[in-house]
């Protein structure tokens, strides 16, 4: 039955395995993620294709928690740039989450297949991500694991929309903010690395990282020493993130507009209370105006993508950091120490007042108080 596990964990609401097999055929295994297996599934009555995530309870408490969390969050949200929940089943041994099927490609694959790729293409991607995130933030939902691998084209049509996936780390932000560090190291915001309480601004930082990569083919933060072990690699990486130590390097950024650099800088502001919100970023001229260049940057971006993201350590870097032990923040310098200057590379281009506080709901969205902690499951 649709949304069968109304009360997660209540034995009287367990579905029998045949309730799943009577309704759906589980087909090809698409991939194996940290907490689950992802299948392509077909609804028997209609022939429609969906994505199915299967979580095995025997894999431990973290897996069970991730499944219940993703279900609870997906039941809350409905937006055209977010993969929608279709059906849920809980048996004694498994959780099954059925969602819309995104039959398109990851953004990287799309770029590599294009004959022409410009800032305008990136602006279109970032606009859709910002709109979805502004919606989530209006509900006090923090995704906490935004990264390129979680952005998909919904189908293979030329004008396909972008959809955000993977909500097992998402959390409802309460008035006390969030203290549990998690996410993918290369996309972590400084406040997470510093083990401070944090909230919705971490998603905006991650969007800045995504935008930086899409415009240059390079990650903004990387371990120059190319340490092989994760702990040394992460320590070097985290030190750079804490200080906002990135540059608009030549020649990769030579043809990128000042407006694009300005938005990256606003999204990747080290101080979370000064970081631009998703709702405000949508009004930036690079998103809603005509500031995005239409110059073809494909050759340079693709060359760097193939160089950087084919490395084994970057393939492994999609790992998710969920345990405090893995998140060892390096020592912080004096708060008064300025971050490396990027003034020579940026030109202010948002003709709007200073960014509103980071917890401001999206424009036009209801001004909701943050729900109580028990809404997160």
Swiss-Prot record:
Cofactor(s), names only, from the UniProt record: Ca(2+)
UniProt biased composition (Pro residues): 368-377
Compositional bias of kind Low complexity: 347-362
Keywords, sorted A to Z: Calmodulin-binding, Cytoplasmic vesicle, Membrane
Keyword Membrane found: yes
Domain of life according to the entry: Eukaryota
Entries under PROSITE patterns matching the protein: PROTEIN_KINASE_DOM
Membrane topology type: Peripheral membrane protein
GO terms assigned for molecular function: ATP binding; calcium/calmodulin-dependent protein kinase activity; calmodulin binding
Subcellular location: Cytoplasmic vesicle membrane
GO biological process: signal transduction
GO cellular component: cytoplasm; cytoplasmic vesicle membrane; synapse
Limits of the Protein kinase domain: 24-287
Main location as per UniProt: membrane
Region feature Disordered, mapped onto this chain: 324-377
PANTHER family, alphabetized: SERINE/THREONINE-PROTEIN KINASE (PTHR24347)
Domain notes: The protein kinase domain is predicted to be catalytically inactive.
Protein task: Does not appear to have detectable kinase activity.
Assembly and binders: Interacts with calmodulin, in the presence of calcium.
Family: Belongs to the protein kinase superfamily. CAMK Ser/Thr protein kinase family.
Protein name: CaM kinase-like vesicle-associated protein
Species of origin: Xenopus laevis (African clawed frog)
């Amino acid at each position: 039955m649709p949304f069968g596990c109304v009360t997660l964990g209540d034995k009287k609401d367990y579905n029998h395995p045949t309730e799943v097999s009577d309704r759906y055929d589980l087909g090809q295994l698409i991939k194996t993620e940290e907490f689950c297996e992802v299948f392509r599934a077909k609804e028997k009555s209609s022939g429609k294709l969906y994505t199915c995530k299967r979580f095995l309870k025997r894999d431990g408490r973290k897996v069970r928690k991730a499944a219940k969390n993703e279900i609870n969050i997906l039941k809350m949200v409905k937006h055209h740039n977010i993969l929608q929940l279709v059906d849920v089943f809980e048996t004694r041994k498994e959780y099954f989450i059925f969602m819309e099927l995104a039959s398109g490609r990851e953004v990287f694959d799309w770029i590599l297949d294009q004959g022409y790729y410009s800032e305008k293409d990136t602006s279109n991607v970032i606009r859709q991500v910002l709109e979805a995130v502004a919606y989530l933030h209006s509900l006090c939902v923090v995704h906490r694991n935004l990264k390129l691998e979680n952005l998909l084209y919904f189908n293979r049509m030329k004008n396909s929309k972008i959809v955000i996936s993977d909500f097992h780390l998402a959390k409802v932000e309460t008035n006390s903010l969030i203290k549990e560090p998690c996410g993918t190291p290369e996309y972590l915001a400084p406040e997470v690395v510093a083990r401070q309480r944090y909230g919705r601004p971490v998603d905006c930082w991650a969007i800045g990282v995504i935008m930086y990569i899409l415009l240059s083919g390079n990650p903004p933060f990387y371990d120059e020493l190319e340490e092989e072990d994760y702990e040394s690699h992460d320590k070097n990486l985290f030190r750079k993130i804490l200080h906002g130590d990135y540059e608009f390097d030549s020649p990769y950024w030579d043809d990128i507009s000042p407006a694009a650099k300005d938005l990256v800088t606003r999204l990747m502001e080290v101080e979370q209370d000064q970081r631009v919100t998703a709702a405000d970023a949508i009004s930036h001229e690079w998103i809603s105006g005509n500031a995005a260049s239409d110059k073809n940057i494909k050759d340079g971006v693709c060359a760097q993508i193939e160089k950087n993201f084919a490395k084994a350590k970057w393939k492994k870097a999609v790992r998710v950091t969920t345990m405090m032990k893995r998140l060892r923040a390096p020592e912080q310098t004096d708060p008064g120490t300025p971050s490396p200057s990027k003034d020579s590379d940026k030109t202010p281009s948002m003709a709007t007042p200073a960014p509103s506080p980071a917890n401001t709901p999206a424009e036009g969205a209801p001004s909701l108080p943050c729900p109580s902690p028990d809404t997160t499951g």
